[in-house]
Amino acid sequence: MVAHMEDLISFTIGQPDFPTPEHVKNAGIAAIDNDFTSYTHNAGTIELRKAACDFVAKKYGLDYVPESEVIVTMGASEAIDIAFRTILAEGLEVILPGPIYPGYEPIIQMMGAVPVHVDIRENQFRFTLEMIKPYITDKTRCIVLPYPSNPTGVSLSKEELKEIADFLKDKDIFILADEIYSELTFDQKHVSIASFLKEKTIVINGLSKSHSMTGWRIGFLFAPENITNHILKVHQYNVSCANSIAQKAAYEALTAGFDDALTMKKEYIKRREYVYNRLTSMGFYVVKPDGAFYFFVKIPKSIPLNSFDFALKLVNETKVAVVPGSAFSNYGEGYFRLSFACSMETLEIGLNRMEHYIKKWS
């Protein structure tokens, strides 16, 4: 709708604005030059699976067996897809926070299952056990825990995660933990809920956000063998295997690029502080994000527009694009998502335009 606009400032981007690290790109080039261009094992090369397990062991204290408890996928999106297609069936329920990234609900519905959203707007966007418990029924099959969250940037503390894990320990309910932003946490070290409840947790991760590799399409699914041996069958008949060239680049990213995310994270923290101060000075109510690179901003009551109309008027009048909150379920209505995955100069120009626009309503 807005891509054709000249002089557009886009705060809609859901990917890092940094290039893939040079050493990672070179590993991909070397894979081509060395003719590493054939199918790999369905679950991915064993060297990459070992590197992935070693990475999450050192970073998050997780213990997975490379031969049987990790699958290399075509991005985190495929990992989510094959997990749901394995564990869901007609009439089962999946509990999700609202607002939430829109990529889960269609897959749940395609399986004939029922998405059950929990409104977390009045809980500082925190998807805690207290919020979850009232929605659990005998049909509940899975709880989706995306943290840090897209679109809110809010994460969960070690204590909050342990409460959820302890409650679910004796229940026949899976946890799908989407931890794709785990390397982009700002104020606290990321804790995986699998460290408390490995046997019922399917961990989704990947390199799109941590190493700015969105187009390489490399994700990881970690789970106990009794779960992965079923998911692997779906993956096998879905895509055969992940891209062989990208797998070589991914191995380089996880080994030689073990801490590559730190450079990006330092810059994101600076941007977060700048954007937070600018938005609050304009009178917006915002929850400061714990990670990722998004603000989920409440539209002031003085502006009598729904989120879509607000975003449309904003882009038409100022050439600043944001994502309407309604894109993130009905519980995103009344908000908009602003991505700070862009330069400080771009942020300053765009926020100056936004401030001028907001003043018209006061």
Regions found by a protein language model. Give the residues of each.
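PLP-dependent class I/II
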Residues: M1-I9, Q15-A30, D63-S362
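Glycine-centered small-residue hotspots that permit tight backbone geometry or close packing
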Residues: G14, N34-D35, G44, G153
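Phosphate/diphosphate ligand-binding glycine-rich loop within oxidoreductases
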Residues: P19, I29, D33, S38-N42
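Conserved N-terminal alpha-helix of the aminotransferase class I/II PLP-enzyme fold
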Residues: Y39-T73
